UniProtKB/Swiss-Prot annotation:
The lineage of its organism: Bacteria, Pseudomonadati, Acidobacteriota, Terriglobia, Terriglobales. GO terms for biological process: asparaginyl-tRNA aminoacylation. The gene is asnS. Its EC number is 6.1.1.22. This is Asparagine--tRNA ligase. Belongs to the class-II aminoacyl-tRNA synthetase family. It comes from Koribacter versatilis (strain Ellin345). GO terms for molecular function: asparagine-tRNA ligase activity; ATP binding; nucleic acid binding. It is found in: Cytoplasm. One of its GO terms (cellular component) is cytoplasm.
Length: 442
């Protein structure tokens, strides 16, 4: 007898009227008299099986009837269209092999009932199997894929910065120290300084990798370990990377809408919010942002009055971004609240040539970027002002000594982008295994 071809559930519609085999897990099981309705999952979707007692052997019927949740199985059956079934297709099961049966005396811990977030995070290694969490991770995968696609099409070269570094990228952030064979080292906060070097070799570069910040923050937007995509462009000024950033975000959103629409529906995302995203993005100066916040305070919409010179906090970003239906770019923050390497505005030395991109719906900053300081002397002075060790930055200063050019770049936190695009309340669901202030397990 000819063996049935193996299919994924996502592509089951290509086999309508045929016998196929799927490999996956029992997601749920419903019994109705002499009918069994097992629902299988394989990482690409759900498929409802059907077993009518009189049409199958007693052994097969009992085998399926006694299956436990999340037991791994190999299932063969005939596919047919059924509008009422999840995914629009059903399988009349003709054979089933149990790969590993979850024991009845130690059942799968995440049952269909409601569970608290601490319980779910403690069982994150299993929680990722739920339809909602799997959909979020597929959307995350598409965001990463489309990011690589965008920069590849734009002629960028992927270059990998080190994860172990001898110094801080930004002196204001807390570092995770590492003993490097007796010498002090740190887990990277950003690949930016290193890709500034590769930009001087290759022109247009980007990096993608993990970053670490030991900030004792418990907000819904902070992780201690997260992933960033960071482009850097030689001979580019602030306006150039602002244009690059809005094109980049628009590309990602359109890719997710095109390729992961079903997953967005699974997590019940309002698609109209994403379909509005297109260039150009609104642009406001820091001064205009301050005015918005002060007016919000006057109306009683914000508790405290924001004063010029402060950095925008999460409540400030949330307030401003909630006023727009697409990402908004805030540019030219005060020099004092930004990193040492940012170029001051030649028309106003109190502000830096920098930009933050705030996602709409109150999600706040997803991108931070700037034009980098070009003068060796000014950069050296800034390093001293920030009380950073000059010796650690000698190589970075060399970039201004040997053929320095105007250059600019930005960084986008993948998890914050996932949170916004998926409409999530907290970044802990945006990454397979979140690392937060009080969680490093599993």
């Amino acid at each position: 007898m000819e063996q049935a071809p193996v299919s994924t559930i996502h592509e089951i519609g290509k086999h309508d009227g045929q016998s196929v085999t799927i490999k996956g897990w029992l997601y749920n099981l419903r019994e109705s008299g002499k009918l069994l309705f097992p629902i299988f999952r394989d990482g690409t979707g759900l498929l409802q099986g059907v077993l009518f007692k009189k049409n199958v052997s007693p052994e097969l019927f009992d085998l399926v009837k006694n299956l436990t949740q999340e037991s791994s199985v190999i299932v063969t059956g005939n596919v047919r269209a059924e509008q009422r079934a999840p995914g629009g297709y059903e399988m009349d099961v003709t054979a089933l092999e149990v790969v590993q049966r979850v024991p009845e005396n130690e059942p799968y811990p995440i049952t269909p009932k409601e569970h608290g977030i601490e319980f779910l995070m403690e069982h994150r290694h299993l929680w990722v199997r739920s339809q909602r969490q799997a959909a979020i991770l597929r959307i995350r995968g598409e965001i990463v894929r489309s990011a690589h696609e965008f920069f590849d099409k734009q002629g960028f070269t992927l270059t990998e910065p080190p994860i172990l570094t001898p110094a801080a990228c930004e002196g204001t952030s807390t570092l995770f120290p590492v003993d490097y064979f007796g010498d002090p080292a740190f887990l990277t906060q950003s690949g930016q300084l290193y890709i500034e070097a590769t930009a001087m070799a290759l022109g247009k570069v980007y990096s993608f990798g993990p970053t670490f910040r030991a900030e004792k923050s418990k907000t819904r937007r902070h992780l201690t370990e997260f992933w960033m995509v960071e482009p850097e462009v030689a001979f580019a000024e602030l306006d150039d990377i602002m244009k690059l950033a809005e094109d980049f975000i628009t590309h990602i959103v359109k890719s997710v809408l095109e390729r992961r629409r079903d997953d967005l529906k699974t997590i019940e995302r309002d698609l109209s919010k994403l379909e509005n995203i297109d260039t150009p993005f609104p642009r406001i100066s820091y001064d205009e942002a301050v005015q918005m916040l002060q007016e919000g305070h006057a109306k009683g919409e914000l508790e405290s009055r924001f004063e010029w010179g402060g950095d925008l906090g999460s409540p400030d970003e949330t307030y401003i971004s909630s006023k727009f239906d697409r990402p908004v770019m805030i540019h030219r923050y005060p020099v004092e609240v930004k990193a040492f390497y940012m170029e001051p505005d030649p028309n106003n030395s109190k502000v830096a040539l920098c930009v933050d991109v705030l996602a709409p719906e109150g999600y706040g900053e997803v991108i931070g970027g700037s034009q980098r300081m070009g003068s060796y002397e000014k950069l050296l002075a800034r390093i001293h002002e920030h009380q950073l060790p000059e010796e650690s930055f000698k190589w970075y200063l060399d970039l201004r000594k040997f053929g320095g050019v105007p250059h600019s770049g930005f960084g986008m936190g993948i998890e914050r982008a996932v949170a916004w695009i998926c409409g999530l309340d907290h970044v802990r669901e945006t990454i397979p295994f979140a690392r937060t202030l009080h969680r490093i397990y599993p």
